[in-house]
Design a protein with these regions (language model features):
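Hydrophobic alpha-helical transmembrane segments of multi-pass integral membrane proteins
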Residues: 1-258
Length: 258
């Protein structure tokens, strides 16, 4: 959140509310996963969904203020909005709801998807597009914004759309990874440079797995299987791409083109 709001002249009250409440809400969410699915688990997850909702309102406020250009701002703001979907699906998972008759696993993974691919990846895309003047990074930012909801639509309604969205997201992911490597070359801190490189490598590996999975599932011979995707793709995205990437950009700070 702070990476998104660094250019604001003064913190918006929605930003302040989200930042102050996110830690206690996150701790309650952890407790939610210690409880059996049901009312108690859902109640413990609701504060996190509320934080995600406030974050989304902050994103809407920024879109109304900034408009749809430049691409890097729209990517940052879109990430703020998409996280609300992740919060809602997380509550649904903890309660035991199965929207669209999805399995419990898919409901949980959808919540996770909108926190990482839906929230953090657009933020990384925005930071990369801001730091590099090449238009390909603007295109990657717009592509991520489109691919996140398209993936959800494809999973729900249309396998061909799902494959297209997965390939689009993977292509944009590779562009973002390359952009982070360019930033790493000129990073002021060696630790930030290393973290950006590791984040980029993780992103490329994760997107390779996602591409293979989407194509093989469409052809009726899914590989890797969902538990393996959750283990490898999920871990690469959560701990590699996102954690290391956010850590690196926090150290380095948003960069304008040199």
């Amino acid at each position: 959140l702070r990476l998104v709001a660094l250019d604001d002249a003064a913190p918006h009250w929605l930003f302040t509310a989200a930042t102050w409440s996110q830690l206690p809400a996150a701790m309650l969410l952890i407790l939610s996963f210690e409880a059996e699915r049901g009312i108690t688990a859902a109640a413990l997850a609701i504060p996190w969904a509320a934080v995600a909702g406030v974050t989304a309102l902050y994103g809407v406020q920024r879109v109304l203020r900034d408009g749809f250009k430049p691409a890097w701002k729209l990517a940052l703001n879109s990430g703020l909005i998409f996280v609300a979907v992740g919060g809602l699906w997380t509550v649904a998972s903890r309660y035991g709801l199965r929207p669209f008759d999805f399995s419990d696993t898919i409901v949980l993974l959808t919540g996770a998807h909108f926190h990482y691919a839906g929230f953090i990846l657009p933020v990384l895309a925005g930071l990369v597009a801001r730091a590099n003047t090449q238009r390909v990074f603007d295109a990657a930012a717009y592509g991520v914004i489109a691919a996140v909801p398209l993936t959800a639509v494809g999973i729900t309604l249309s396998p061909p759309v799902e494959v297209f969205a997965a390939l689009l997201l993977a292509t944009c992911g590779f562009c973002i990874a390359f952009g982070q490597l360019l930033v790493a070359r000129s990073a002021k801190r060696s630790l930030a440079s290393l973290l950006l490189a590791l984040s980029s490598l993780s992103l490329m590996l994760a997107m390779t797995l996602a591409t293979i999975y989407a194509i093989t599932e469409f052809r009726g011979a899914r590989w890797p299987q969902i538990p393996d995707m959750a283990r490898w793709h999920g871990t690469l995205n959560a701990l590699g791409t996102c954690l290391l990437g956010v850590w690196a950009w926090t150290l380095e700070g948003p960069k304008d083109p040199q």
